[in-house]
Amino acid sequence: MRDETPEQPALLRSGYTTGSCATVTSLAAARLLLSGIASDVAEIVLPKGQHVPMKLVFCRLLNDGKDGAEAGTIKDAGDDPDVTHGAIVFARVRLADAPGVRFHAGPGVGTVTRAGLTLAVGEPAINPVPRQMMTAHLTDLAAEYGYAGGFEVAIGVENGEALAQKTMNPRLGIVGGLSILGTTGIVRPFSCSAYIASIHQGIDVARANGYRHIAACTGNASEDAMRAYYQLPDIALIEMGDFAGAVLKHLKRAPVDKLSMCGGFGKLSKLAAGHLDLHSRNSSIDLRQLAQWCASHAASNATLQAAIVGANTSQEALAMALKEGVPLGDIVCARARDVAREIVPASVEVEMFAIDRQGNIVGEAR
């Protein structure tokens, strides 16, 4: 997850997806094989029609062309930081007798080993839109040169296997490296679309592998709490980060039997107030709201409520309430559960768990 930045520039720079990088490098390598021309720059057309020139860091024959050709470009994510920013994405292309394009996982690109994704088990983790982009460009290239054969395309990412450990790929059953992603070809700054897509994939993989109880967690401590509480395997633990809404809305289309949500007390207080994006950039902890919720409990009093309004942090407010016998953690969890119930199908059993900074459960509601 990203740290909050106090000031955002007025205009943020977009970047390009790994799918765009794979397309431009496969096109350049194939063009070298068909024309003998090694390019420094190649232009592709994105799914929405934009023409984009991209620089190449290499474009060369392999073994004088006997082993095909390869081209590489540096992944530029713009002002949207991700694990692949600055990595070299490359394509190795061979000509084939049979028409069409066949895809392979090169070094640093993973292979699908679990059901539930948009790709079949055993396929390279090159998502559908990047496949469509590469196929369209290579088909046009073949027509341009009067070439009737096909292409064998292996996509790789420098250091991709190590980078993949920083993603959800291992949990999704994508082994050996990264996924080649993208739907528009462009990375929008702070759109978080890739992260949200991985949340959806995590739910789909859990369902496809027979897990009807999932736990959506805001971070490592909440995951550890749910793993210990329910002995759930990693495949049933969904790392939602701040995107509670991404989980709840996806369950409308892909429901499970039971959803356990677990997060820090402060983050769950935001969900309880109706916020579905829990990042501090987009929602704030409301101490006055916490004080009002306390007021509904018999053990509460005006002194406690005033102290909560003046608290430095939500954790301090929680400690004050608990000291006075007010189960503020349970109150917040009950309200967060009710918000979630309004979104997911009625058939989904929802429960909430709040933890403190040490990972201890300080509130729950079923």
UniProtKB/Swiss-Prot annotation:
Molecular function per GO: cobalt-precorrin-5B C1-methyltransferase activity
Keywords attached to this entry: Cobalamin biosynthesis, Methyltransferase, S-adenosyl-L-methionine, Transferase
EC id: 2.1.1.195
BP terms from Gene Ontology: anaerobic cobalamin biosynthetic process; methylation
Keyword Ribosomal protein: no
A family per Pfam: CbiD
InterPro entries named in the record: CbiD, CbiD_sf
NCBIfam families to which the protein is assigned, alphabetical: cbiD, PRK00075.1-1
PANTHER family the record matches: COBALT-PRECORRIN-5B C(1)-METHYLTRANSFERASE
Protein name: Cobalt-precorrin-5B C(1)-methyltransferase
UniProt source species: Paraburkholderia phymatum (strain DSM 17167 / CIP 108236 / LMG 21445 / STM815) (Burkholderia phymatum)
Species lineage: Bacteria, Pseudomonadati, Pseudomonadota, Betaproteobacteria, Burkholderiales
Gene name linked to the record: cbiD
